[in-house]
Swiss-Prot record:
Belongs to the HPrK/P family. HAMAP family: HPr_kinase. This is HPr kinase/phosphorylase. Its cofactor is Mg(2+).
Length: 304
């Protein structure tokens, strides 16, 4: 993933002082304040990072002798820098403008204070540059738990989502789930063209937002649980005690997975509701229902 400098300019309302290479992309989510570089130290310098000059760096340059400043700025801007942002609406030294034009480097200016600008850009890039993938499935918010429903086409994922929406839960996306990893969590969202849309066989595509209200759709949700639908197989030994822990790896993060056998007569929406509440219970309780049963059996044995 990469972010163009022009997109950064638009999203942060930055003033363009020098136009640079339009093809250059931002590919790392770290920033650099070049105080050490302007002092002549270039070990471990990362020119691919966004360079931000704040009041401290600006004052340091201001106090330099003109010839020294020209020499330092010339060397600094000889590197293939992605872009340079001057914060606090400070006036750039003319050496910066001259060398930036010569080397085709973007020089931008922001009215924000330096620390806030760095914080906003870091969070912005962490989101935009997060690893992504797209999976086939349906993502719903059930009782506050983000549940990814998977399974082969035609098994009833969308119909189950529709029933959950009718019961007051919320849809994030149907059919295609865009997933990005952000700080160890998985965030699911919908492709732009299908936001709020649900495809139901026999009916067609329905606009969930229009039929069930704005509160029935969410833009994104952290994925906590996977419910995998499969056709009921009589010879399959399905988990009946909740002790068979399965996980699915998405972008290097394991997500708890439950396999739900589907056959006529089973109310799958109710099962998913129960799974969501049970998942929340497992996070809050140190004892499982199986442990409770075993404790009761031990108590009965002791009484006998």
């Amino acid at each position: 993933m990469a972010v163009s400098v022009k997109r950064l300019i638009n999203d942060f309302d930055l003033e363009v002082l020098v136009e640079g290479n339009e093809d250059i992309k931002i590919e790392v989510n770290d920033v650099n304040r070049p105080g050490l570089q302007l002092a002549g130290f270039y070990n471990y310098f990362a020119p691919e990072r966004i360079q931000i000059i704040g009041k401290a760096e600006w004052s340091f340059l201001q106090d330099m002798q003109i010839e020294v400043r020209k020499k330092r700025v010339k060397k600094y801007l000889s590197f293939n820098i992605t872009c340079l942002i001057i914060s606090r609406d400070l006036e750039p030294h003319e050496e910066f403008i001259k060398e930036a034009r010569k080397n085709n480097i973007w020089v931008l200016r922001s009215k924000s204070v330096t620390t806030k600008l760095i914080s906003k850009i870091t969070l912005y890039l962490a989101d935009k540059l997060a690893p992504e993938t797209r999976l086939h499935g349906v993502l719903v918010d059930v009782s506050g738990i983000g549940i990814l429903i998977t399974g082969e086409s035609g098994i009833g994922k969308s119909e189950t989502a529709l029933e959950l929406i009718k019961r007051g839960h919320r849809l994030i996306t149907d059919d295609a789930v865009d997933i990005r990893e952000s700080d160890g969590t998985l965030i699911g969202s919908s492709p732009k063209i299908t936001i709020g849309m649900l495809e139901v066989r026999g009916i067609g595509i329905i606009d969930v937002t229009q039929l069930y209200g704005l509160s029935s759709v969410l833009e994104e949700k952290e994925i906590k649980l996977i419910m995998h639908f499969e056709h009921w197989k009589d010879d399959n030994d399905y988990d009946r005690l909740g002790i068979d822990n399965q996980y699915m790896d998405i972008l290097g993060i394991p997500v708890k997975k439950l396999t739900v056998p589907v056959r006529p007569g089973r109310n799958i929406a109710v099962i998913i509701e129960a799974a969501a509440v049970n998942y929340r219970y497992s996070l809050m309780s140190k004892i499982s229902p199986v442990d409770i049963i075993e404790n009761r059996m031990s108590a009965v044995s002791d009484e006998a």
